[in-house]
Curated annotation (Swiss-Prot):
The zymogen is transported to the periplasm, where the propeptide is removed and the enzyme is further subjected to an internal, autocatalytic cleavage to generate an alpha/beta two-subunit endopeptidase. The proteolytic processing at the cell surface is regulated by the environmental pH. Present with 5000 molecules/cell in log phase SD medium. Induction: Positively regulated by cell integrity signaling through MPK1 in response to cell wall perturbation. This is Aspartic proteinase 3. PANTHER family: ASPARTIC-TYPE ENDOPEPTIDASE, BETA-SITE APP-CLEAVING ENZYME, ISOFORM A-RELATED. It is a lipid-anchor; GPI-anchor. It comes from Saccharomyces cerevisiae (strain ATCC 204508 / S288c). Optimum pH is 4.0. One of its GO terms (cellular component) is extracellular region.
């Protein structure tokens, strides 16, 4: 059973004003050109079943257990992956660690008075305030109504300020926090004391976010000084969660339209939704970077490090040509005039066996969310069934996965077509193995709105996120290179070219149709490709004119990647 994430945003008042964040170079700016307009954040890859037991050596694995009734039970461990960065917040600085997430846009950190911390346990005498409100005037939550994530659902509301600035609506109620729940070791990733910082300023805007696994965070927005990597950031709005059962906060670097002040129900309560300057925008407005862009490089699945690079692209970390495709708006029918998340169009999916045997499964256009906060890959049920059939995999209702013979080598690849260029992912990227038993780590979804390209896909791609032009540039990732060839992004991504099918994007949902051909290029639509691409006229059979990814690479920047995996049984 898939654990679905549920996120909701609750805002008690609008920010009083927009604060322009500033970046002050730290003393140890950079060893290279101090005038370079890019920012590198380092990350590690870590794995585990929870944030409390993560480690760099805990790779995803499948274990077989013999039950008393004679049946074998499959236990899947270490399945979830995240990225984390270390921050110093406040004056004097307090150390906290947060997860980096391209699928959200707000920064929140854990408060030191969190009652779920074992050090703060006061049993049932420690109570939390739950805002109660009359929804009759709001028409419900905008987030709930639009279901912006497809596979995510939730509720949100903006609550008018009271005398305290935190309550609202028709009153408040209290709920106790049992001592049995106050068990978190909050010192592991750090907490933040607002009273311990002379520079913290609250703006009395209430924040709340919740997740489908039962975790949540609530608190108040404010501003303070942040130090991360070689930067000192001032004026960045973030939330301090004085109540959360999640052991780590989140640094959201997504589109500003995904901020809780915009995609929550602020419009229903105040008459307008608004966006504030989140972390990537603050970097640009302060002059630290020239464009609101960043490049993500996960390296291969066995690597312990990866990088994210704000405001630049590293040509040493990818091979072939960097192709650009538009971000598509999957929520236009819900009233959004522009995209709020990183959805792109998959124009086709196929399977290749070392290029000697290629088969196209479908050329139906599918919208897919690029999400570094999701470990596995989720595709429409019909497509997963096609892949399973080609691999000879059988679905096990008891396990909830397709079971297949473990591949003997990496010759088999799943090929994703994006507007006429390919990202090839070896089958091993999607395999969960015990050594003798293998599971297909591609999860079927009920329709195309739930398609997610998670880390198992993103490991194979170098991805540049252009938040200003609403475009994504991708190329095949090059692994374990120590060289750098960094180029600043000013307006458009350097060396990137529009994909030949740039305008051939998803617009409406459609049934998945089998067949087609992604391994040849129609002669009437031949585009100029750099690299060693052979073109030919499309035919009914998938004769190979496979795109060669060439020999260019893009370097990215370091962050701390944390992998957690939930058992889907």
């Amino acid at each position: 059973m898939k654990l679905k994430t549920v996120r909701s945003a609750v805002l008690s008042s609008l920010f009083a004003s927009q604060v322009l964040g500033k970046i002050i170079p730290a003393a140890n700016k950079r060893d290279d050109d101090s005038n370079s307009k890019f920012v590198k954040l380092p990350f590690h890859k870590l794995y585990g079943d929870s944030l409390e037991n993560v480690g760099s050596d805990k790779k995803p694995e499948v274990r077989l257990l013999k039950r008393a009734d004679g049946y074998e039970e499959i236990i899947i461990t270490n399945q979830q992956s995240f990225y984390s960065v270390d921050l110093e917040v406040g004056t004097p600085p307090q150390n906290v660690t947060v997860l980096v997430d391209t699928g959200s846009s707000d920064l929140w950190i854990m408060g030191s008075d969190n009652p779920y911390c074992s050090s703060n346990s006061m049993g049932s005498s420690r109570r939390r305030v739950i805002d109660k409100r009359d929804d009759s005037s709001s028409g419900g939550s905008l987030i709930n109504d639009i279901n912006p994530f497809g596979w995510l659902t939730g509720t949100g509301s903006a609550i008018g300020p009271t005398a305290t600035g935190l309550g609202g609506g028709s009153g408040t109620a209290t709920q106790s926090v049992p001592a049995s729940e106050a068990t978190m070791d909050c010192q592991q990733y750090g907490t933040f004391s607002t009273s311990g910082s002379s520079t913290f300023r609250s703006n009395n805007t209430y924040f709340s976010i919740s997740y489908g696994d039962g975790t949540f965070a609530s608190g108040t927005f404010g501003t303070d000084v942040l130090d991360l990597s070689d930067l000192n950031v001032t004026g960045l709005s973030f939330a301090v969660a004085n109540e959360t059962n999640s052991t780590m906060g989140v640094l959201g670097i997504g589109l500003p339209e995904l901020e809780v002040t915009y995609s929550g129900s602020t419009a229903s309560h105040s008459g307008k939704a608004y966006k504030y300057d989140n972390f990537p925008i603050v970097l640009k407005n302060s002059g630290a970077i020239k464009s609101n862009t960043y490049s993500l490089y996960l390296n291969d699945s066995d690597a312990m490090h990866g990088t994210i690079l704000f405001g630049a692209v590293d040509h040493s970390k990818y091979t072939g040509t960097l192709y650009t495709i538009p971000i598509v708006n999957t929520l236009s029918a819900s009233g959004f005039s522009s995209p709020i998340q990183f959805d792109v169009t998959i124009n086709g999916i196929g399977i290749s066996d070392s290029g000697s045997s290629n088969k196209t499964l479908t050329t139906t256009k599918i919208p897919a969310l690029l999400d570094s906060g999701t470990t596995l890959t989720y595709l429409p049920q019909t497509v997963v069934s096609m892949i399973a059939t080609e691999l000879g995999a059988q679905y096990s209702s008891r396990i909830g996965y397709y079971v297949l013979d473990c591949p003997s080598d990496d010759s088999m690849e799943i090929v994703f077509d994006f507007g006429g260029f390919h990202i090839n992912a070896p089958l091993s990227s999607f395999i969960l193995s015990t050594g003798t038993t293998c599971l297909l780590g591609i999860i079927p979804t009920s329709d195309d709105t739930g398609t997610i390209l998670g880390d198992s896909f993103l490991t194979n791609a170098y991805v540049v996120y252009d938040l200003e032009n609403l475009e994504i540039s991708m190329a095949q990732a090059r692994y374990n290179t120590t060289s750098e060839n960094i180029e600043i992004i000013t307006s458009s991504v350097p060396s990137a070219v529009k994909a030949p099918g740039y305008t051939n994007t998803w617009s409406t949902s459609a049934s998945i149709v089998t067949g087609g051909n992604i391994f040849t290029v129609n002669s009437s639509q031949t585009a100029s490709f750099s690299g060693n691409l052979t073109t030919s006229t499309a035919s009914a059979t998938s004769t190979s004119s496979k795109r060669n990814v060439g020999d260019h690479i893009v370097p990215s920047l370091p962050l701390t990647l944390i992998s957690l995996l939930f058992a889907f049984i």
